């Protein structure tokens, strides 16, 4: 049986703003925990979020640079899930009205041009940071420390359509997107500092099938090398499973950099699991003027 892989990439880029997405707390780069906090970014009752105009401008700039259609009106939604580093128990994001839709990004591999289709570009606030004792995995940790300096930092999320067919294409796409964010001066794009993070959604299906296979999400890829190796491993794992008659389960898997394998983290959530609904607190906005792109 001839099989083909299909890959989609979700990328989060930390924006170069002085303050957080919905409050006036400074964006800080420090190892000292919990020094840039306020009632808004740690979700205390009664605190009202006010959107960061500069962050929305940066996201719009990236959306324009990738040829997206800019929505005339934007609004914010609550993405509901429960995790210790999410103090409100929901994340302010965007759902059916993102900043941009239906763009593309040109990549070059071995002097050959290709275009990766982008489904959407939208805003999302960052979570806090969890540090687990021991191996760094929550399953084996005896304690977990929480740092909320990062909570509420503005991110732009870029979601591709499932059009990538190899790890080489995926790496080329991330390299190009990273360079674009640096050229636009909207992010430092430093992987080692977590300015740019990415997850891969991978499925394998028969070559002649018009439908995609069961999607598996891969997390914890902290470098381009990790991205390439994790995708290659997961394609091989799913291919062997299908050839052996084993059903692929929709789930989220963790890339182990040392063992160079993926392992099950949890069942994969869908949009219904997050129970998106419009957030009544931050005001919606309208794109009255658009930023100008020069020299890119």
Regions found by a protein language model. Give the residues of each.
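Basic, nucleic-acid-interacting segments
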Residues: 1-288
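Single conserved hydrophobic/aromatic residue that forms the stacking wall/gate
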Residues: 287-296
């Amino acid at each position: 049986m001839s099989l083909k892989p299909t890959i989609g990439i979700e990328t989060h880029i930390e924006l170069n703003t002085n303050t957080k997405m919905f409050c006036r707390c400074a964006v800080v780069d420090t190892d000292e925990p919990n020094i840039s906090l306020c009632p808004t970014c740690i979700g205390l009752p009664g605190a009202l979020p006010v959107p960061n105009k500069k962050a929305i401008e940066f996201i719009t700039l990236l959306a324009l640079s990738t040829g997206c259609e800019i929505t005339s009106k934007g609004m914010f939604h609550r993405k509901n899930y429960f995790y210790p580093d999410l103090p409100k128990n929901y994340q302010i994001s965007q759902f059916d009205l993102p900043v941009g839709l239906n763009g593309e990004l040109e990549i070059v591999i071995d002097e050959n041009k290709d275009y990766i289709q982008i489904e959407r570009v939208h805003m999302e606030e960052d979570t806090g940071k969890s540090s687990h004792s021991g191996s760094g995995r929550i399953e084996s940790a005896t304690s977990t420390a929480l740092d909320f300096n990062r909570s509420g930092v503005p991110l732009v999320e870029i979601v591709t359509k499932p059009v990538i067919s190899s790890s080489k294409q995926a790496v080329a796409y991330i390299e190009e997107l990273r360079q674009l964010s640096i050229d636009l001066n909207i992010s430092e794009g430093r992987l080692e500092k977590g300015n740019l993070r990415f997850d891969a959604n991978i499925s394998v299906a028969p070559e002649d099938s018009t439908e995609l296979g069961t999607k598996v999400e891969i997390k914890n890829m902290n470098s381009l090398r990790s991205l390439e190796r994790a995708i290659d491993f997961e394609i091989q794992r799913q291919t062997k499973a299908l050839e052996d008659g084993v059903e692929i389960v929709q789930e989220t898997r963790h890339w182990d950099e040392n063992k160079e394998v993926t392992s099950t983290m949890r069942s994969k959530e869908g949009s219904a699991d997050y129970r998106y609904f419009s957030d009544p607190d931050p005001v919606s906005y309208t794109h009255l003027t658009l930023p100008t792109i020069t020299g890119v």
